[in-house]
Amino acid sequence: YGGTAPNTLLKYALNYAHTGSYTDGKAVLDVCDDAAKINWEGEWRTPNTSEWNELHSECIWTWTTQNNINGYKITATNGNHIFLPAAGYFNGASHYYADIQGYYWSSNLNGSVQLTSYYMYFDANNRIRKDISRGYGLSIRPVCP
């Protein structure tokens, strides 16, 4: 979860249920472990669930292809837009659903189920906010306030 270097697994990826490791009890990603903050520096960071919720409910999502890559063009009421590629996800070295589905981390961890963190899932027909094991390799769309 939130790797700051390729193929790294941080302390958030494991918990007692799977490895016998400790359970950290955190609800929000630490700044020092935020891949967006580490890789982009400055004020960039991984968006939180409130920001994903706003994007989900307040913007227009249009499935499209840009530069031969499927994904959503997300347009705000003021006309600003971003493109989120359907990049799929990684489980270990295996890459799944590229160009079909998108999986994007939020900075919020599921405090009640220590193994999971919240993310935004989408495909051509669905957009769902869910939680998933922190051990998966999902995309990060950095935001800057």
Regions found by a protein language model. Give the residues of each.
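Conserved positions within compact, well-structured domain cores
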Residues: 1-145
